[in-house]
Amino acid sequence: MLVTLLETFSVVFQVANGDGNCVPRFQDDVEFCDNYILEAVTEASKMIAPRAREQKLCCGFNKFTHCVTTASKKCSEAADRVKRVLDTKMTSLGVHCPDTNKVCNGGVNTSVSANTVTVYLLFSLGYFFYMNKL
């Protein structure tokens, strides 16, 4: 799993920053999008029922995915490439969120792994370390 996380992080950075300055153009938006994940993780940690926790994480992740994909459109075709790469890599993690479109308030219906919350948190952390070195 660690190899998949590191590989995903590397590929997303290469794809998103393909023109040399894509990531800085939507950095603030990505920081805003992180709030969806952080809120979901905080709320899920207070829940007792495993299914309710999973639904909360899936809804937060779906909102985050939609937010990041929208933000990356500032980099022209990077949004499609980022989404394709993430979908491919994340699908390989196995456990998929159920159709949360019915249970999420305005949630975006995507097929993603519940474990990808961890991937995105690591991606965000690595992203901020990367940006602080520039």
Swiss-Prot record:
The residues of the propeptide are: 19-56
The tissues where this chain's protein is expressed are given as: Expressed by the venom gland.
- Compartments in which it is found: Secreted
Signal peptide span: 1-18
| Cellular component terms per the entry's GO annotation | extracellular region
* Record bears the keyword Iron-sulfur: no
| Keyword Amino-acid biosynthesis listed | no
Q: Report keywords, A-Z.
A: Secreted, Signal, Toxin
- MF terms (GO), sorted A to Z: toxin activity
What is its biological role? Probable secreted venom toxin.
Name of protein: U35-theraphotoxin-Cg1a
Q: Which organism is it from?
A: Chilobrachys guangxiensis
